[in-house]
């Protein structure tokens, strides 16, 4: 059995340490309260309880169990001494809040960090520097920047304040990069003017530089659309045609028009291969300031093309993107593997959904790629348009979708918009805190939603007043806006232009505890829907009161699913079907242990 030390390092559980600690506490006054046999019984019981959890336990959890068992033996004076000892040690630790965790990072024995993000290798110097900065930022955030009740609620797993290691800086979460504006109208990267590219391959190269710059100025993911690169296929076609005609003139050859077209298209195809490969390899080999490759999603949507010619060019880019992803990349051992990034999203639409449709071959290729590489992800144009006022657009980075928004001319706008940040509510804790009483459930729910609202407003207010100079690539040079130097970004924080999200976790366990059944059971589904509607109404109310784009965020937690489970077990013990796992179910998802086929799950 393993334990997690306070600095995040993992070590083997040692029962002798409990015996020694309790014995020392008992020997610190005249006359012992417990015999050696009683102390050993306490240690063995604590070991038994820890083993039943089926996971690594923290030092704090072990000390809580020890304290409870001392009390259970009736040794109240000893328990008081033990509590005082813990308090004194906590004061020492508070006076030196980050040293141990940073040292454990440098020595590569911080187990929390190893499990936190599979995209980061904590043994690498550049990654360590990011984690070290994160520790300092998190420490500042918890001690000086956030209200104490929000910090405590986060520590206790009542809520999760996302990305607190970036909160000290004025940074936002994720976005849709307005690549079209930057390529068509030019941009500035590191003080260097970048004008409109004169070929497809150059456009791809510039796109990767933009991606790296954007990733270094935010903590969340970003998305680009291949449709914004498609116009440069024609630019390259015209350029190649001019070059071929010049070559023909030089050697005195006059090819028939069809032969000329074949030569041009052949060279163009090579350039598309080169450009797509540039994006594929640059994205996974670039290192950003947050110690990892850019978290990028690439959107593949034929109907974003402005005309039929551009749609055909876009189809060529999509085809090559899928082919290269199907092939994969070689790792250091020379084995073909699936790269983590960029993520791919393929849109199913009328032109590619049915056999016989002009671009069905792309859907077949996408399905083939999915069967081997588990990408791309899919969006139904038809369903998304039903839900998003007739629009189809990508999620921001991983999974956060914007709400429709119109500019002053009444035109919908999606690219150039962003998410301010996320706070997640632990629905399981709401249910358990109510004791199963439905009236109390809604009362506790209101209290927790108010806590989330205040935490989200901390996120919003941290961005408020930020100058465009903080991230010129984002705010001045087109990725998100074209603001002037020294101009505040405040206007972009209101009116629904950007979103700020309430995440939720554990709907399954919440419903299971309150009703005794899964939320997929027809008799319990209504309660699950009531919970969802309640959160949605809260967001609508906050939006109305503040003119800020509050929204609901599904699937918000990753490693926090384990943190929440650990906190629930500590607060409420092991409850079969609710807290008996080392994780809780993410958002509205069906529990992994539940027997259900894929199609029923999708329908649900």
Predicted features by range, described:
Residues 1-109:
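Charged, amphipathic alpha-helical regulatory modules used
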Residues 23, 453, 457, 508-512:
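Amphipathic, well-packed alpha-helical segments that form the structural scaffold of globular domains
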Residues 44-51, 296-304, 509-512, 516:
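Short, hydrophobic beta-strand segments
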Residues 500-513, 533:
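Contiguous, well-ordered alpha-helical segments that form the cores/surfaces of helical PPI scaffolds
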Residues 88-92, 98-496, 517, 521-604:
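Conserved catalytic cores of very large enzyme subunits
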